[in-house]
Swiss-Prot record:
It comes from the Bacteria. Pfam families: Ribosomal_L32p (PF01783). This is Large ribosomal subunit protein bL32. HAMAP family: Ribosomal_bL32 (MF_00340). It comes from Bacillus cereus (strain ATCC 14579 / DSM 31 / CCUG 7414 / JCM 2152 / NBRC 15305 / NCIMB 9373 / NCTC 2599 / NRRL B-3711).
Amino acid sequence: MYLFRRTSKAVKRKRRTHFKLSVPGMVECPSCGEAKLAHRVCKACGTYKGKEVISK
């Protein structure tokens, strides 16, 4: 049986530097000017691609 060497804090933290969240792609709504997620319906006015999808 082989005893493995303990992973040090530095090695563990260097490996985890790539585990991070990405910033969501925010764009300005062409109808109302609110910030919204790209390729999704605007929560403020309910429009998508210039058409009203959700009536507010």
